[in-house]
Amino acid sequence: MQLSFILTSSVFILLLEFVKASVISNPFKPNGNLKFKRGGGHNVAWDYDNNVIRGVNLGGWFVLEPYMTPSLFEPFQNGNDQSGVPVDEYHWTQTLGKEAASRILQKHWSTWITEQDFKQISNLGLNFVRIPIGYWAFQLLDNDPYVQGQVQYLEKALGWARKNNIRVWIDLHGAPGSQNGFDNSGLRDSYNFQNGDNTQVTLNVLNTIFKKYGGNEYSDVVIGIELLNEPLGPVLNMDKLKQFFLDGYNSLRQTGSVTPVIIHDAFQVFGYWNNFLTVAEGQWNVVVDHHHYQVFSGGELSRNINDHISVACNWGWDAKKESHWNVAGEWSAALTDCAKWLNGVNRGARYEGAYDNAPYIGSCQPMLDISQWSDEHKTDTRRYIEAQLDAFEYTGGWVFWSWKTENAPEWSFQTLTYNGLFPQPVTDRQFPNQCGFH
């Protein structure tokens, strides 16, 4: 009897210790996702359950995009002839050569985003930035034309973020061979990320990022590392992509880091990733990044404003059902695809019927200058922004694309805010509860 009691007590104590240890290292959300991993002196500096991300992307800084900074690409244009204009950063650096490209980019990196931008971002009520960067900032392939030097500015940015109480995702925006063929991957119309050594090189680059920015030195600032921006699921091998995500996750955790791992949804439907990288499989602190745009097909562009808002609201309902934490890591105010070179150099706009066999909807001319927008378009834009904010804040929050552009107002947080179209404060609503969440 006594021996039985001692054994029972011992089992109970062991069970209690196991439960305590599990709770300390694996505090679960009700849906089975992990909130934090505590212990070992580590705390994640962001509570994805209870805090709402309100942020901007620092686009066009370390990865050039022709529509964001056309002034860097227009010198190659000959009148209306765009045939000599590089279509992406790869061809831009290749055309200029390393010396000239480096000189121009050093000036660009030191001026496009400065400490003053971080102060403004904070003063406007934002708490977060997502920083896109290409693999070439960390490792060059043989014969790559890219130039390096981005990392010193990335590290300045992390310091400016810390000083202004802003949290950061470091987002690997371009992989060798390109993961999507978009110009914002560095290399347009290429889909070779999964060929040759490209996936392994990407993992090597991620390992460098993990060791530099995934540890204690930046744990108060970096609240996520995004393994890869917008891998184009429909043209990639999804089994290989999942293995890449798993390898990236394991690589980060093997460094001892508790930093959340961010995976983009690869343009799959809501819920696709629910059973991948789960606590049940021993993976934790995983966030799914969804991007929300409604301008990259003729069908989307032809929607009226009520339809645009309905789609945005449904995003919120669908995202809420997912088992992982999720964030709208990119979105914009765009109701047209009119920004010059948005669809790529030497490509027109669907809105004008000048690209992708899309039907003509209207002229792009007034859309390029916010002072020429009609009152109706301004109202529609404000309504659309507010609906998206409501939808995204129904879950983990939002990261607007982008903080600034040279002359693409639908894509510039600064321009929209200073013209009264983006709410200020960001919680202000002229059109409250459009989605009926409350």
Swiss-Prot record:
Binding site residues for substrate: E65, Y67, E230, Y293, E300
An annotated GO cellular component of this protein is:
cell surface
User: What does the UniProt induction comment state?
Assistant: Expression is maximal during the early rapid growth phase and increases during biofilm growth. Induced by caspofungin. Transcripts is also regulated by RCK2, SIT4, and HTG4.
The leader peptide range reads 1-21
Q: Oligomeric state and partners?
A: Monomer. Interacts with the human antimicrobial peptide LL-37.
Q: What does this protein do?
A: Major glucan 1,3-beta-glucosidase required for cell wall integrity. Beta-glucanases participate in the metabolism of beta-glucan, the main structural component of the cell wall. Can also function biosynthetically as a transglycosylase. Functions to deliver glucan from the cell to the extracellular matrix. Does not appear to impact cell wall glucan content of biofilm cells, nor is it necessary for filamentation or biofilm formation. Involved in cell-substrate and cell-cell adhesion. Adhesion to host-cell surfaces is the first critical step during mucosal infection.
Which protein are we looking at?
Answer: Glucan 1,3-beta-glucosidase
